[in-house]
Amino acid sequence: MNIEEVTAAGVEILHLLQDYHRPPAHREMLIDPILYAFMKGRFGAVTRQHHVSVYGSQKPKRIDFRVGGTNPSVMELAVRSPLGSGSLLGGPNTSELRKLCKVSTTQAKLRVLLLIDLYTNHYTKGDLQASYDVVHAGPGKFKRCPVRVVYVHMNNRFNFCWSPYK
């Protein structure tokens, strides 16, 4: 899985949701099964709720998706509803970024936070990236890896790299 394929998956989900008169798009957990089915059909070796150990945590954290194969990837999903909210900004996604950046390179070569925006107005790359620049990976001695943030809206799509070393 690469960035172009993740972006294409996000765009396809937006198109699939438009086929519904009343789309199931008000919460992330209603879009999650649609994305899982799409990815399972496209990539095959997809697992949900992949466990990752986090320093200082009693039990492992869960990441939404892991795509296996010779170039494994992990992905978290965040959705902004048609009613709007700040759920795609950096602050609300701190825990997702921290989980993703702690996945070792043996478990995943690519770490992606997929942001699907269903609101009428879209974010600009500068505004969204600025909200992620202030987020850090947290304290502790552990290896941190960068995370690719992929934003998908019907009228705008872009991606940028979030560095855990800011």
Region spans (language model):
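A short helix->loop->beta-strand "cap" motif at the edges of active sites that frequently abuts
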Residues: 107-110
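Short, well-structured alpha-helical interface segments that form or flank functional binding sites
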Residues: 26, 30, 34, 60, ...
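Conserved catalytic cores of phosphodiester-cleaving nucleases, focusing on short active-site segments
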Residues: 65-84, 100
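Active-site metal-binding core of divalent-cation-utilizing nuclease and nuclease-like domains
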Residues: 45-74
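A generic structural signal for short coil/turn motifs at secondary-structure boundaries
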Residues: 22, 84-87, 122-123
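Domain-level recognition of nuclease-like catalytic cores that cleave nucleotide substrates
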Residues: 112-166
